[in-house]
Structures are given as structure tokens and as C-alpha cells.
Amino acid sequence: MRPSTASTPLSSSALNYLESFERNAKALRGNNNGSSTSGGNKKDESSTSKSIVSSPAPVKRRVSISDIISQARRQVSLSRTDSEDFDFLNESLKSSVFDESVSSDTDSEESHEEKRILPLGTPGQQVGRKSLKDIRELRNSIDQSLIKPPELKMLRSKAAGEESKRHAHFESIQEEEKISEDLPTAQLPSKSPFKKAIQSGSESSDSDSIIFDEVFEEVLPSPPRKPAPARTAPIVVEKKIEKPAVKEQKARKKKEKTPTPTESSFESSSDSSSTSESSTSSESSSSASESESESKSESQVSSSKTSTSKASSSKAYGSDFESEKSSSSSASTISKVTPKKLDKPQKTKKPDKKRAKPDDIRQNKKPEPIPYEDFIPKLSSRSSNSEKSTVRETNRTLEESLKKTLKINKSSEKMEKPRKDIRRAPRSSSSSSSTLRDAEREQDIERRREKRARRFRSRRRRSEEPHTCQENIHNMIESVIDTHVQMLDDFNRMEYAAVCEWTQVLRKFDGHDGPSSQKLREIIERRLNRKY
């Protein structure tokens, strides 16, 4: 029924609109058929039979919509520019199809021919019942579909969904990036010392608002190595022993100074005497000489203290050899200080106070042998295991032992000279008891020297055994071979014991000859001759 697009000036939307009207008309036709059957049930059977007989051949027939559409198309083809006729057709269609008086109850009693808009009996196109509201909804949906087709809607919704998904994906990525960026920024200000100053907004640099402990907890350098206690202990012992001697000399000085003003006051009151003046002058000169000697000894002690402090600081950062040199040198300086302190007061003091001197000498002499034992390097695990030691350890032990022997010999030679001076002084001044004590001390010192000499000899023997890398490697290979040989010996012993046991079993079975004994012999021979 559709003409070609070239002959019709109507647009595709208008043609679709007309086709929709045809569909609505067919729907109304089915609706009218249903209403006629419902109205016929109320009437008598005679009237229904008459209507059924008269329905296939009606007297007057209304024009169908299909006829109207065909007429409209013909008119449009004849007069293409007449738009008024098209408007009239639309109005007539609207008034005929969408008339509300059709569905009213008052018109149900009228004849079916007047009611019927569309003719019955259109073949093969019976549509179910539909009310006018449904038809209007269909029409509105068709109009909306002409304005906005559903395909575009679906496409737009899909595109919008994809865009929204992409947008959400990008937002999630941005949030993750923000979180990852926020994490380090949250950690950094906790460690920064300027956090509180920045938060408070104070322009002045307050020392209270800046906490430097947070920063320098991790950056603090590791403390230097503490020096070995065996090397520093003897120096401290001598310092402690030297202090009481200095205090005693100061106390004596005060005692000697106190009578001088009293004597001078008595002399001024009595106006007599050159003798008392000479005594006071001699006492003052002796006190002056004592003060000078004390100042010298104190300066020497302070210098020795500084040297020991330098030695202890050098121990932390220097090598072991330097620390040993410094300890031996500090020991020699302290030993030099002690005899000077003891010799000078002897010349200045009077012979009445000579009896008190040996006690001071004993106090200073008692601790003297202590530091030399401590300065002797003790036998370490290195020297005891030097035969099986590695290359580095053997070389170190050699160098250390040789240097230590040289240093200790020098220090012992230096220390012998002041000891001889100290021995001479008490012999000339002290009693027989002091000489006995000195003899005992000398014997103890000689014994200690002998012990030291024995130790040095044993060390030299041990250190002289491995000299070169080649010998060290040779010793290592020998030890490895020894272990392997021991393992092989153990294995051979076990194997021999097993063979002996099996041979004893065989000898026992030799007395019982038979088929079972022969089988056992074969099995035992197989097991003994098995190649592992």
C-alpha cells in the first residue's frame, strides 16, 4: 500500500503516524466487537439473533480509516501543496477515532451499526480488547518515539555509563595517589624539630618551640671505644696514692707556718734577738723550698695526667700498638715523678724529721710493682691457638709479642734507676727494720722478674713456630687431612668388627651342614661381597 518516496512529499514521520492510526483503529474494532457481545447478553435472544443476521450485510456502512488514508494519499498526489486538506483529514480522523462517546454506557442501547467505527470481518487481524486509555498511551509513546527514538536513548545511557565508570576509576586513582602523598607528609613533620614553631605561627625562633631531640635520636654518632681497664687501672692507682703524700706535705707546711707569726710577735714585743729571727728565716726558707718542690711535683703530676688522658683518647681511635706506647710512656713519666718528689724534700728538711721519711717512702714504694704486672700483656686465646690460627692472627700475634717485649724491657730498665735511688735514701737514714723490709721487697721484685722472663720465653717459642703464609696453609691442610684420616680409621674399624662378627656366625654354621645352611652361607657371602 505504501507509495514510493519520490511520488509522496510526506515525510517518514508522517507516514509512521498514519500507520499508527491504522493499528489503533484495528484495536478499536476488536474492542467494539467485545462491547457488542456484552450488550447483546443483556437483551433477548431474539434481538441478538437479528443483529447477528443483519451484521454481515449492513444497510449503511461507515467509511473505514484505510479508505480515508488511501483517499488522502490520492489527494496529496494530485495536489502536493494543499496543506489544508491534510489538516482537515487529521481533524476528521481524531474526531472519528478518539471520540469518548463510544465507550459511554448511555449509548450501549443504540444499534450496533451506528456504534461500529470500523467494519467487521477484516481477515486475519483480530487484536484483543483495548480501552481508549491504552490507545492514548500508545499514541503518546509513538509521538515520544518519533521525537526521541529509543536507540539514541540507549546509546546515550551506555556512553554515560562508560564515562561515569571512567570518571569513578580516575577518582579512585586520584584518591589513592592523594593517600600515598599524604602518608610521607604525615610522617615527616613528626620528626621535624620546627613542627611546633610552624603550627604556632610565631615568627621569632623560640628555643622552647623547637625540639632537636626528635631529629638527633637517629643521627647521634656511636660512642668511641672504651679503653681496656687493665691498661688504665695502674695509672689511677698511682694517682690515688700520690695524693695522700701531697696532703701530708701541705699539713706539715701549715704546722710550720703557724708558729712563725707567734714567734715574730714575741720578738717584736720583747725587742730581743737575732737567734729567733734566724730560726724563723730558716723555717721560711725551708717552707719556700718545700712549696717550690711541691709546685714542681704538682706540675709534673698534672703533665702526667694530661699525658694519660691523651693516651686514653688515642686508645679509642688509634691502633693497639700506639695505645701500648702511650701506656708505657705514661708509666715511665709517673715513675720519674715519684723519685723527684721524694729526693727534694730530703735536702731541705731538718734531720729531726728524717724518721718520718721511710713511712712516706713505703707508701710510695708499696704500689710500685703493681702497674708492671698489669702492663704485661696476658696470654690470649690467640697466642694459645697460634699453631692452628689463620694467617692474620699469626702475623698479629708475632708483631704484638715482639713489640710488647721490647717496650717492657725498656720500661723495666727505666724503672730500675729510680728504684736504686729510692733504696739508697732509706739505707742511709732508716733503721734495721726498714732494711729488712727493703730486702723482702727486693726478693719479691726479683721473683716477679723471673716469672716475666719465663713468660716471654714461652711466648717467643710459640710465636716463632708459624712464620709465613705457606706454613699456615700447610698447617691447615695437615689438620684437614688428619680429620679425614681419623674418619677413615673409624670406618675401617667398624667394618672390620662387622666382618669378624659375620665370620663367627659362619663358623658356627659350619658344624651344621645341610641345604638351609648352604643357603645362609650364600646370603652371607653376598652381603659381605656387596660393593657399597
UniProtKB/Swiss-Prot annotation:
Residues 347-356, 449-461 have a biased composition (Basic residues). It comes from the Eukaryota. The lineage of its organism: Eukaryota, Metazoa, Ecdysozoa, Nematoda, Chromadorea. Residues 30-40, 198-213, 259-290, 298-315, 326-335 have a biased composition (Low complexity). Residues 26-84, 97-129, 157-470 are annotated as: Disordered. Residues 157-181, 237-249, 357-368, 389-403, 410-419, 437-448 have a biased composition (Basic and acidic residues). Residues 67-80 have a biased composition (Polar residues). This is Uncharacterized protein F59B10.2.
